[in-house]
């Protein structure tokens, strides 16, 4: 595959930024992972549509990248085209409803909403995700999930057709949604709750403080590695088997929160995967509970 020629063709007629053999360690919160064959960074609806149609025409594998959180890219990298959405950020407010492009960062959306006196999204304070990625995985905390607020989601299906899906047409479950199979999220519309600005900001600060005090945010990480099994907290299970502080290469089970694996410097995806396997095996053997990954895994090993 001539990546330079493909990149040039993808850029034709647009001021689209396209990178070849781009290390995805630069674009993920874990700061690790191999290269993308092609990385495109659309800044408008037109550019996003063009990227998706280009991948279809060329038969390229397609991955949609938001802020790179909740994601492990293997060391061999990702074949085909990776489209990074976070360069196209737009927010429109109409009454209690707020429409955001998929690449809008949740912290930015929360800031805009709070200034307008719109509450209900405070549980998402500190989640380092784009709106598109967050709605696909139904991101949230024990205080709430994004799917609870969704009015509608605009998607482009795999044939390039546009659909507006209402909440009732989408299945939201714990850290998952049917949007995984729907295509590419373009915009998300949420319905929030009017409230006093100081009260909203107080809740945001309380949630940020709680997150900072309980999570190892001083180290590169991808958020929670495992889903909580029904009736349990994954972090407590991992702690119960004595896995806090376990280390493989530069990857370590965080002392502050055992459901986080941190990159202490020069960690590889292979280090992380080996640590994940060790933790899962220990929890299954000692407690009889299978831990399911919350993170996504892309690409191929070396």
Curated annotation (Swiss-Prot):
<comment type="similarity">
    <text>Belongs to the MurB family.</text>
</comment>
<keyword id="KW-0132">Cell division</keyword>
<keyword id="KW-0133">Cell shape</keyword>
<dbReference type="InterPro" id="IPR016166">
    <property type="entry name" value="FAD-bd_PCMH"/>
</dbReference>
<dbReference type="InterPro" id="IPR003170">
    <property type="entry name" value="MurB"/>
</dbReference>
<dbReference type="InterPro" id="IPR011601">
    <property type="entry name" value="MurB_C"/>
</dbReference>
<dbReference type="GO" id="GO:0009252">
    <property type="term" value="P:peptidoglycan biosynthetic process"/>
</dbReference>
<dbReference type="InterPro" id="IPR016169">
    <property type="entry name" value="FAD-bd_PCMH_sub2"/>
</dbReference>
<dbReference type="GO" id="GO:0005829">
    <property type="term" value="C:cytosol"/>
</dbReference>
<keyword id="KW-0285">Flavoprotein</keyword>
<keyword id="KW-0274">FAD</keyword>
<keyword id="KW-0573">Peptidoglycan synthesis</keyword>
<keyword id="KW-0131">Cell cycle</keyword>
<keyword id="KW-0521">NADP</keyword>
<feature type="active site" description="Proton donor">
    <location>
        <position position="224"/>
    </location>
</feature>
<dbReference type="GO" id="GO:0008360">
    <property type="term" value="P:regulation of cell shape"/>
</dbReference>
<dbReference type="GO" id="GO:0071949">
    <property type="term" value="F:FAD binding"/>
</dbReference>
<feature type="domain" description="FAD-binding PCMH-type">
    <location>
        <begin position="32"/>
        <end position="195"/>
    </location>
</feature>
<dbReference type="InterPro" id="IPR036635">
    <property type="entry name" value="MurB_C_sf"/>
</dbReference>
<dbReference type="GO" id="GO:0008762">
    <property type="term" value="F:UDP-N-acetylmuramate dehydrogenase activity"/>
</dbReference>
<dbReference type="Pfam" id="PF02873">
    <property type="entry name" value="MurB_C"/>
</dbReference>
<dbReference type="Pfam" id="PF01565">
    <property type="entry name" value="FAD_binding_4"/>
</dbReference>
<feature type="active site">
    <location>
        <position position="294"/>
    </location>
</feature>
<keyword id="KW-0961">Cell wall biogenesis/degradation</keyword>
<keyword id="KW-0560">Oxidoreductase</keyword>
<feature type="active site">
    <location>
        <position position="175"/>
    </location>
</feature>
<dbReference type="InterPro" id="IPR036318">
    <property type="entry name" value="FAD-bd_PCMH-like_sf"/>
</dbReference>
<dbReference type="InterPro" id="IPR006094">
    <property type="entry name" value="Oxid_FAD_bind_N"/>
</dbReference>
<comment type="pathway">
    <text>Cell wall biogenesis; peptidoglycan biosynthesis.</text>
</comment>
<dbReference type="InterPro" id="IPR016167">
    <property type="entry name" value="FAD-bd_PCMH_sub1"/>
</dbReference>
<keyword id="KW-0963">Cytoplasm</keyword>
<dbReference type="GO" id="GO:0071555">
    <property type="term" value="P:cell wall organization"/>
</dbReference>
<protein>
    <recommendedName>
        <fullName>UDP-N-acetylenolpyruvoylglucosamine reductase</fullName>
        <ecNumber>1.3.1.98</ecNumber>
    </recommendedName>
</protein>
<comment type="function">
    <text>Cell wall formation.</text>
</comment>
<dbReference type="GO" id="GO:0051301">
    <property type="term" value="P:cell division"/>
</dbReference>
């Amino acid at each position: 595959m001539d990546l330079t020629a493909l990149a040039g063709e993808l850029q034709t007629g647009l001021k689209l930024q396209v990178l070849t053999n781009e290390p995805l360690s630069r674009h993920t919160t874990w700061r690790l992972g191999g290269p993308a064959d092609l990385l495109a960074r659309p800044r408008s609806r037109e550019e996003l549509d063009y990227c998706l149609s280009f991948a279809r025409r060329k038969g390229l594998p397609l991955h949609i990248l938001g802020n790179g959180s909740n994601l492990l890219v293997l060391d061999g990298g990702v074949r085909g085209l990776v489209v990074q959405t976070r360069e196209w950020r737009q927010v429109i407010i109409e009454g209690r409803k707020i429409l955001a492009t998929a690449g809008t960062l949740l912290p930015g959306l929360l800031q805009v909403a709070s200034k307008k006196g719109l509450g209900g999204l405070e549980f998402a304070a500190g989640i380092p995700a784009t709106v598109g990625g967050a709605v696909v995985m139904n991101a949230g905390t024990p205080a709430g999930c994004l799917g609870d607020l969704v009015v509608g989601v605009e998607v482009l299906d795999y044939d390039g057709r546009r659909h507006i899906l209402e909440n009732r047409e989408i299945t939201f479950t714990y850290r998952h949604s049917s949007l995984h199979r729907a295509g590419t999220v373009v915009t998300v519309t949420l319905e929030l709750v009017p409230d006093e600005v100081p009260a909203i900001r107080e809740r945001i600060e309380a949630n940020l403080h709680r997150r900072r005090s309980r999570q190892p945010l001083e180290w590169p990480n991808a958020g929670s590695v495992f889903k909580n099994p029904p009736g349990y907290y994954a972090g407590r299970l991992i702690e119960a088997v004595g896995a806090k502080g376990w280390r493989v290469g530069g990857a370590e089970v965080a002392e502050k929160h055992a459901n986080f694996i941190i990159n202490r410097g020069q960690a590889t995806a292979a280090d992380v995967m080996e640590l994940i396997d060790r933790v899962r095996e220990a929890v299954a053997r000692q407690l009889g509970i299978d831990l399911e990954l919350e993170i996504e895994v892309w690409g191929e090993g070396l």
